[in-house]
UniProtKB/Swiss-Prot annotation:
Gene giving rise to this polypeptide: uxaC
Homology family: Belongs to the metallo-dependent hydrolases superfamily. Uronate isomerase family.
Any GO BP annotation: D-galacturonate catabolic process
Pathway this chain belongs to: Carbohydrate metabolism; pentose and glucuronate interconversion
Name of the protein in its database record: Uronate isomerase
Organism of derivation: Salmonella arizonae (strain ATCC BAA-731 / CDC346-86 / RSK2980)
Amino acid sequence: MTTFMTKDFLLKNDIARTLYHKYAAPMPIYDFHCHLSPQEIADDRRFDNLGQIWLEGDHYKWRALRSAGVDESLITGKETSDYEKYMAWANTVPKTLGNPLYHWTHLELRRPFGITDTLFGPDTAESIWTQCNEKLATPAFSARGIMQQMNVRMVGTTDDPIDSLAYHRQIAADDSFGIEVAPSWRPDKAFKIELDGFVDYLGKLEAAADVNITRFDDLRRALTRRLDHFAACGCRAADHGIETLRFAPVPDDAQLDAILGKRLAGETLSELEIAQFTTAVLVWLGRQYAARGWVMQLHIGAIRNNNTRMFRLLGPDTGFDSIGDNNISWALSRLLDSMDVTNELPKTILYCLNPRDNEVLATMTGNFQGPGIAGKVQFGSGWWFNDQKDGMLRQLEQLSQMGLLSQFVGMLTDSRSFLSYTRHEYFRRILCNLLGQWAQDGEIPDDEAMLSRMVQDICFNNAQHYFAIK
């Protein structure tokens, strides 16, 4: 019987163990997409206790707590203490066997806290609370300290075009901190014309860009000013959350002006008008990214805020989203081609939330590759509900079968937690075990030099090269 979570966790043969311990584990982390707070990094936040750093804002854990029947007051309630929430989590963790949360919880205790020989649960919670809180009181366990312990080289936060990026500039000016914290442009509110808050958002964009927006060209000018601001602050990537992937041929500016005017007047748009406007903004943005050398990321297929009652109570991003099942292949093909036809398709990473679409994305990438950029269009790592063992394996295997795994830019945390860097470790163990199994089975050569290069490239080198501004 194999012991739970030894140093060789998930590594089933000697080849895998060599690849992980000798080559993957020492590589730095290039976390090009996350939801960390730049303010917390700028302020070098110190966490009061384990409950605070572990559970605050973590909707993965919140969903598990709700599934275990825990009262909402012990999940998000302001009337309960961090310790009470922590104990609710301690009572829930033994019930998560088979869920990636069980693995992540124990990996997070191992690194950075050094707790390697204790299962987390109600019987051990008090001891672990004390041990971890003692460490959290030291400088090595501040927000920056944890990032340094985990060998992070770069993080890409997720930022709205109206953001001042003051905290990014503060971090960049601090020579004592060697980790790059780059903003990522997330313009969802500027192209989702169908959303209730669209008109209010345009008002905020007007103020940030000092442009009065009444026509489509005004919107372009406002976004251009903000793109320039982001570029000046070190941005090299854009991200887009696309629940429903729409496409329609882009009409002329007069028609786009009419669509925008209807929306500003409070009139209802047709589905065609929504698709025309959305496509026009996304295609124009893609061309701007290409001109700047940025990477365009498309996260496709979530259904968000499913629970109206809880959305009214807690707002978005609180654990009430799930996997959508819209067809995406035709619209995605046309969207990418609309940029590529003028040779203005930027480097692009495609993510799907529905694993049914894995092969759709894996094959779509091959349609739009380009000379001089290895893996110009990427099939991104298992996202959200898929960043677990089976989901990561599916993505790696399907990418290898339909593209070039060797050119993959690898893992990202996509997380709001400073403890989630162990997801890179989880991914690296799964990657090394997959390659080790293939080599042991004679499906690929057992060539340490060849395999080690591939591992190190996927863990760090490919992403570092891919996100560089050339």
